[in-house]
């Protein structure tokens, strides 16, 4: 096996002007830096939409995508956002990710871009190939109309179409922009090492769509949860709270959902 080296740098840590690192020019500059330094790998953290504590290891879906990584300058060049809207997103604290501001403003801007986006055959073909992202989009639309409550408390079944449309646009745009960065890196001899969460959140599209694949009771509460025993990092151990998989149930359909989860499948990573 050939010895090689790489750098772990999540997309959010790339330099940029819009509150968070993105798939913009800084991503290509980082690839150039890796090539110049003789590196062979770029490793990232999961691309999942992070939870309220900004952790990509706890998300609304294994197949979700972080909208903050979308390059806004590319959307401007495509005529999907205005110059005024672009400049309105310039960061106010340049050396950190502006999480609170992103929560308040980014999806609203992407919703405008989604409304202006005309779609097309390539757009629809994407969802034929990546149908698993549709469940996530429907889930987010359901949460929106139910006041962001966990899915087992939903009373409204009618989805918010504008939210569904926005998340479809986010997924398509994310993949399209990421593919350009990945292809650029591969062309420079840089392979991408990906990552995904080991478990999923209880309130997630994964559990909502496939509750039988998890160890839950009739009220959708986990009967067993994930964690780790005491170790040198935590004398009391850790209780993560994620529902455990029901492997016997998954075996009935050949573990189909798990076969979609590897980052090489979800996001097209090299490893």
Where are these regions (language model features)?
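Mature N-terminal, pre-catalytic/accessory segment of carbohydrate-active enzymes
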Residues: 1-38
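Hydrophobic faces of well-ordered beta-strands that scaffold small-molecule active sites
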Residues: 5-9, 42-43, 192-194, 271
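Alpha-amylase-like alpha-glycosidases and glucanotransferases acting on alpha-linked glucans and related
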Residues: 8-10, 16-19, 54-175, 200-271
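Short alpha-helical segments and helix-capping/turn motifs at coil-helix boundaries
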Residues: 25-32, 125, 176-184, 258-261
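Catalytic domains of carbohydrate-active enzymes, especially glycoside hydrolases
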Residues: 25-50, 264-269
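Conserved, mostly hydrophobic/aromatic
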Residues: 34, 44, 139, 185, ...
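Short, solvent-exposed turn/loop segments enriched in Gly/Ser/Thr/Pro and often Arg
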Residues: 43-53, 196-202
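Conserved, well-ordered alpha-helix/loop/beta-strand core segments that scaffold catalytic motifs
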Residues: 167, 171-201
């Amino acid at each position: 096996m050939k010895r090689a080296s790489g750098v772990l740098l999540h997309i959010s840590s790339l330099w940029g002007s819009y509150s968070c690192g993105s798939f913009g020019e800084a991503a290509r500059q980082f690839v150039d830096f890796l090539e110049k330094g003789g590196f062979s790998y770029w490793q990232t953290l999961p691309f999942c939409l992070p939870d309220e504590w900004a952790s990509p290891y706890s998300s609304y879906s294994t197949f979700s995508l972080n909208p903050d990584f979308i390059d806004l300058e590319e959307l401007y060049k495509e005529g999907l956002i205005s110059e005024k809207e672009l400049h309105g997103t310039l960061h106010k604290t340049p050396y950190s990710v502006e999480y609170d501001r992103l929560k308040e403003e980014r999806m609203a801007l992407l919703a405008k871009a989604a409304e202006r986006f005309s779609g097309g055959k390539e757009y629809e073909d994407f969802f034929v190939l990546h149908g698993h992202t549709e469940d996530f989009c429907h889930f987010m639309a359901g949460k929106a109309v139910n006041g962001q409550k966990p899915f087992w408390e939903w009373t409204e079944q009618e989805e918010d179409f504008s939210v569904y449309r926005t998340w479809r646009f986010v997924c398509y745009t994310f993949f399209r922009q990421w593919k350009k960065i990945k292809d650029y890196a591969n062309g420079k001899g840089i392979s991408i090492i990906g990552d995904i969460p080991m478990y999923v959140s209880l309130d997630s599209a994964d559990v909502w769509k496939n509750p039988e694949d998890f160890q839950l009771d009739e009220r959708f509460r986990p009967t067993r949860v994930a964690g780790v025993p005491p170790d040198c990092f935590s004398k009391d151990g850790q209780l993560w709270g994620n529902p455990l998989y029901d492997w016997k149930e998954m075996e009935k359909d050949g573990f189909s959902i798990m076969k979609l989860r590897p980052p090489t499948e979800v996001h097209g990573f090299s490893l």
